[in-house]
Structures are given as structure tokens and as C-alpha cells.
Amino acid sequence: LSMTMTFAENEELNTTNTANAYKMTVNYSRLADALCLSIDQLEAVQDIHSEFCADMMNAGNANADERKPMVEKALQKDLKHMRYVLTENQYRKYLMLLNVTISNRGLEK
């Protein structure tokens, strides 16, 4: 019985860790400072990133074999929209921050 409970506990912990890896919330004021965003850009970035967060949480809750394509699609959509809102320098910095975040969470392409 204790072995079963241990496995169930580990499975629950793995599920929690997986869900946390896909949680992409950010501190918008820090992001605005890092990217030197205008008020209008900040509002657009918040909208775009909120949609990205929802897409990533959907990927985190999907079956393991569906996650990678869902993450790819979410990333491509996010980057496409951010490229429209950000300047070239802001976009480069955003891309660097996003790549580091994705890498740190073990979600590399």
C-alpha cells in the first residue's frame, strides 16, 4: 500500500511540475522596463501575452504527445504578434528573454 501511495504522490508531483513549467505569467512592469515599452505597447503586449499564457497552459494540460506541437504553435503565434508590436531592438530582447525562459523550464524546441 505504501508503494502505491508513493507512486501516486510522485505522479501528482510530476503533474504539478509539468503544469508549472507551462505557466508563463510575467511581471509586466519589469518586462516594460526591460523592453522600454510605451503605454500603448504595454497594453498590446499584455493582451498578446495573456493569449500566449492560455495557449501554453492548454499545452501543459494536453497529452504528452500533443504538447510539443502545441508549444510550437503558441510560440510562433506569440512571436508573430510581438514582432508587429515591438521595435526590432525590443523584439530581439524579447526573443532572448523568451528563449531563456523556455530553456530554463525544459521546454526547448
Annotate each PLM feature.
Residues 7-109:
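Charge-rich (acidic/polar
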